[in-house]
From Swiss-Prot:
The gene is murA. InterPro entries: Enolpyruvate_Tfrase_dom, Enolpyruvate_Tfrase_sf, MurA_subfamily, RNA3'P_cycl/enolpyr_Trfase_a/b, UDP_GlcNAc_COvinyl_MurA. UDP-N-acetyl-alpha-D-glucosamine binds at residues 91, 120-124, 160-163, 305, 327. This is UDP-N-acetylglucosamine 1-carboxyvinyltransferase. Belongs to the EPSP synthase family. MurA subfamily. It comes from Shigella boydii serotype 18 (strain CDC 3083-94 / BS512).
Amino acid sequence: MDKFRVQGPTKLQGEVTISGAKNAALPILFAALLAEEPVEIQNVPKLKDVDTSMKLLSQLGAKVERNGSVHIDARDVNVFCAPYDLVKTMRASIWALGPLVARFGQGQVSLPGGCTIGARPVDLHISGLEQLGATIKLEEGYVKASVDGRLKGAHIVMDKVSVGATVTIMCAATLAEGTTIIENAAREPEIVDTANFLITLGAKISGQGTDRIVIEGVERLGGGVYRVLPDRIETGTFLVAAAISRGKIICRNAQPDTLDAVLAKLRDAGADIEVGEDWISLDMHGKRPKAVNVRTAPHPAFPTDMQAQFTLLNLVAEGTGFITETVFENRFMHVPELSRMGAHAEIESNTVICHGVEKLSGAQVMATDLRASASLVLAGCIAEGTTVVDRIYHIDRGYERIEDKLRALGANIKRVKGE
């Protein structure tokens, strides 16, 4: 397995170009199964999960190629099963189910894998599709969905806010007969992006970005060209990198209005932040950040995917900060690893109490999930001595060329090929 060897401490400064959002690119790739004409998707990040998704679409019979943009022609899809060998590494594959059953009347997906952070059940996807008229069976580790004729529009009230299930229901409802209303829908920018992609293909959707999405079913979706929005979590990660190293950074190809909660907390931490239409700059003026209190919750509140990075920020900040995680259980696996580097933290239920220290020391640490592993790499950049981060395949699932981008900011980081 590959590792990162990071030599610190370094002050990170310079410019970084933000990639397309993984969490928008994946649902958009699967939503392309709904299209009866070719689609071109621009600004798709080069990531393991994206490669897996493209491979899965090919196995279903779609023509998929990448030359800068990703081109998908789903006219000849003739396989309706997403097999275990592709699905086991990636939760996003559940998003194949809604489009398959909506367009072809049948679909089956192996129960998914991905990061092991707490319970991420597929129940909400299943109950949403059932309310649209699909028959669902769980057999031999597969979720199997079928419908005679078309799905039927429905008034669906989500039990809890779920990005994944909102995507599934919204995609399936585009080809349903009649109107579907999703109440308590997720409001994330990536939901808005997926809806806007579907609208480009001819879907009739309104209310995306609010907790009530209305979809009027159409008979077919055509093709089109669409550009994926910038990755707000990658943007936030690089902003934190500059903040903890007392540096300065400009993030290009960013979308500031998707990061309001994160930018507010960085300002609280003492960062000088400016934004333009597609850029964000952060300057610490050489100062150490101040500890901040953070509580994660669904958008537009503070994103759970930035929790590990802010835990690290608090652990090297002036003062004591509290980080409360309300979205996922079991999402503090980075804390014991950071403690190996000299961080002072206590976990009480779903809160980490962070006592800031002046400096961290390099150590051998292990990545446990995607965002936790990013925080360990950033910790290595500012720690004294050498840090080796193991199991970095987690990072490759969500960050495009993170070592190249960090190196351009002054980090001393090398990928060491595993046995």
